[in-house]
Structures are given as structure tokens and as C-alpha cells.
């Protein structure tokens, strides 16, 4: 698990490593090998750790179960406190996944990103309007 997490952290440009022990206590080490706790990091750094853990769990479940789920739904992962570099790194990871990916977002910054198709849902009074762009 730790190897998977750190592989994703590397892809996200993190300059630190993350480890979980058998009781799921975390240790975060910088290049100088100083130990830190998760809450001592910036929101952007925590975002990278969170995304790395998410993808590591996904990979681990695939390895253990032997089944291949081909849908990935990410709800508001680009709406939080990540910086532009963190979001760019996430998009790069998503570009290498062959599954159907659904990114749900309320952020306007996602509109500038290139996706194969977008479904825009807007409230119009008491009803929702749906626009599909290809």
C-alpha cells in the first residue's frame, strides 16, 4: 500500500513520502527524513496525499479482488484547496486511466479543462437544464 501511495505522490510532484503502519497511523517524511504528521502540511500538500491514497486504494482493490471496475467517479476532487499544480498532476493521472471517468465539480476552473465530453447541469428555477458538449 505504501509503495502505491508513494508512486502516486511522486507523480503528483510531492517532495515527501507517506507511510501507514499496521494500525493506519501515518508518518510523513521529507527529503531530510524528518517526521511530520498529516495535519502539519498545507492544504495543497494534504490534497496530494489524499488523492494518492485514493488511487492507491483503487489499485489495491483491483489487485486483491481480481476484478476490473471500469468506472471512476470523482466528486468535487478539484473543488477543494488544491493548487494549480496539484490539479494538473491529477489530470495527468486521469489521462492514463482507460476507464470511464466522471468528474463532478462546482468549480468554474474545471470549465477550462479539456475532457472528451462534458455534462453541464444548471438550475433553472425549480428544474435542471442539462447541456452535453462533445
Regions found by a protein language model. Give the residues of each.
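Terminal ABC-like ATPase head and other globular end-domains that cap long coiled-coil arms
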Residues: 1-134
